[in-house]
Amino acid sequence: VLISLPKRDTDKPSNVTIRGIGGQSLAMRPQVRLTEGRLPRPGSAEILAGQSVARRFAGAGIGETLRFGMRDWTVVGVFDAGSTGFSSEIWGDADQLMQTFRRQAYSSVIFKLSDPSAFDAFKARVESDPRLTVEAKRETRFYADQSEVMAKFLRILGTSLTIIFSLGAVIGAMITMYAAV
């Protein structure tokens, strides 16, 4: 979920991603480590802030309070996710966040198979179950698909600007040559 929070220095709002987590979330992400404070208690209005969020946004430091989803949330921990995008997120109890944002179902579930080569069999079994409406993807594929739309937009924008500026340069050169003659 995206929320808007004011930045510390400018007070201008900027978007921040909120992610619901469970008890094993840090174990699932070995690159993420708690640097300050503690993990949120399940069922509470406590959150973890990524280092980037804690540093850049008002109210996102440890012990501070953020208001979103018509509720006050206390930052009880700060985590470092290295150079990943997770450092720009806020994490809280998944069930509490689902209630706050009136979500009826999880948008994604992340888990680790004991044998990575069993993924294809797992995918076939889950996707063929008529009770479920899911699409199983490896996490790397999920994020690649997410960024593909933006990459396509940027390619089209870049090509369009290149053509426009090229035409402008050609016309400018023609006008200059005509004026010189």
List the predicted regions and their residue ranges.
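Short, basic, helix/turn surface patches
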Residues: 23-30, 103-109, 162-168
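Extracytoplasmic
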Residues: 11-18, 29, 42-46, 61, ...
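Hydrophobic alpha-helical transmembrane segments of multi-pass inner-membrane transport and secretion
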Residues: 151-181
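Short, solvent-exposed hinge/capping segments at secondary-structure junctions
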Residues: 24-31, 49-63
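The feature marks short, hydrophobic/small-residue-biased sequence motifs that occur predominantly
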Residues: 2-42, 75, 91-94
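A secondary-structure boundary/capping signal
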Residues: 22, 49-50, 93, 139
